[in-house]
């Protein structure tokens, strides 16, 4: 009986934990900081005009960050706002920000005092990744492009109360103040 019970437990364990989730997520991040010179915005330039369909933003530990998007104006002497402030809501997962605009440059401006973005992936009208020609200016925001999944599934995000466990563990590990005190890491 013991052998049968152990065998079934092992079999169930292997089935239950197989493909539970991804073991890789963006590790480095760019910090937008209001009041810091050049840190409130990211200004991206492309080799040529490109239709930006979406920005895929992987947020750090703080949720509900707000960003406004700008493109160069027709005269080339300023910037035009192309969106109302966009709320990027979820931590530790990819958030889609619709853009649908053809441009050679794009400015992303944070509306918050601090916003940590672990990675930004820019997708064109065909869903292909577009790396800005000045990505090296913001290396923490563009250094882990390969982690963006070709197909979105549950494996690439935290769900239900996993959000609290993962977030609390991250905060403890990095010496940050803890957001949720009722869930252990």
Predicted regions and their residues:
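Solvent-exposed serine/threonine-rich low-complexity stretches and specific carbohydrate-binding patches
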Residues: 79-91
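Membrane-integral, polyisoprenol-dependent glycosyltransferases
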Residues: 1-33, 43, 49-56, 63-65, ...
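Exposed aromatic-hydrophobic patches
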Residues: 43-46, 90-98
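Soluble non-transmembrane domains of integral membrane proteins
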Residues: 49, 61, 85-87
């Amino acid at each position: 009986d013991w052998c049968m019970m152990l065998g079934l437990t092992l079999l169930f364990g292997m089935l239950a934990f197989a493909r539970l989730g991804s073991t890789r997520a963006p590790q480095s991040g760019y910090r937008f900081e209001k009041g810091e010179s050049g840190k409130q915005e990211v200004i991206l330039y492309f080799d040529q005009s490109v239709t930006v369909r979406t920005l895929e933003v992987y947020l750090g530990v703080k949720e509900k960050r707000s960003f406004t998007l700008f493109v160069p104006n027709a005269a080339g002497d300023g910037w035009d706002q192309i969106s109302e402030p966009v709320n990027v809501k979820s931590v530790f997962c990819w958030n889609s920000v619709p853009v649908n605009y053809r441009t050679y440059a794009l400015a992303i401006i944070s509306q918050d005092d601090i916003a940590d973005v672990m990675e930004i992936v820019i997708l064109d009208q065909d869903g292909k990744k577009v790396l800005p020609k000045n990505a090296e200016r913001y290396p923490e925001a563009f250094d882990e492009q390969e982690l963006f999944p070709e197909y979105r599934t549950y494996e690439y995000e935290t769900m239900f109360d996993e959000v609290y466990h993962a977030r609390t563990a991250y905060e403890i590990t990095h010496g940050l103040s803890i957001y949720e005190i009722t869930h252990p890491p």
